Amino acid sequence: THIDNLDDFIEYLKLEKFSLLVHDWGGPIGFGYAERHPEKIKNIIISNTAAFTFDWIPFRLKIARLPFLGRFLIEKLNLFAKFATFMTTTKPMKKNIKEAYIFPFLKESSRKGVSSFVKDIPMWPEEQSYELLVQIEHGLWIFRERPICIIWGMKDWCFKRRLLKRWLEYYPEAEVHKIKNAGHFLYEDEPEKILNIVSDFLKRNNSYEKVR
């Protein structure tokens, strides 16, 4: 799994203790890793993601999950990557930024992973990753006493405000920053603002031991 891949990568880097930032699929993958190694996590930054079960996805993703049509749109036409360059931000991306997002998926063979990711969104108990997501959700409480910062793009059509509210049920003491004019790729919409938020949070919470 991607959790195993992340585990191997962090082990290779020999990281003993670090701050964890999760976004999109990084939510379940990052928390899946963190729950295996809670002693390594100093603090956590969460942005526009979910690491818990939910029973709603946007119509656009439902289309992408259709067995034959979804695969054709993603793998043959590369529409998932192309649409991501203008449907995930509130401000137009520069040409070179768009090209950077599309570059890893120029070949049809390189899009199979994208197709698999979309198909693997665990909505129902019978789906492949659902049980693992439930396990991750049940482990979220482990980090309730850690410093947690939530940064949320409020104009995200996919990870909507209802998911931000869910996060606050798990981490009611979290520091929250709502970025009003940012979409799903909030780091593209408001890079300087978010850089300042993250830098300030890390300076104030450089070590879990100090906070305790």
Describe each model-derived feature in a short phrase.
Residues 56-116:
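Helix-rich cap/lid subdomain of alpha/beta-hydrolase
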Residues 16-56:
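Conserved hydrolase catalytic core segment
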Residues 1-22, 196:
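Active-site loop/oxyanion-hole signature of alpha/beta-hydrolase fold enzymes
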Residues 2-3, 160, 187, 191:
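Amphipathic alpha-helical segment in the mid-to-C-terminal domain
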Residues 110-169:
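Conserved serine/cysteine hydrolase catalytic core
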Residues 173-212:
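Catalytic active-site module of serine/aspartate enzymes centered on a nucleophile-bearing elbow/loop
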Residues 11-17, 38-39, 145-146, 173:
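Active-site acidic short loop of glycosyltransferases
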Residues 21-23, 45-48, 115-118, 149-152, ...:
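Short beta-strand segments
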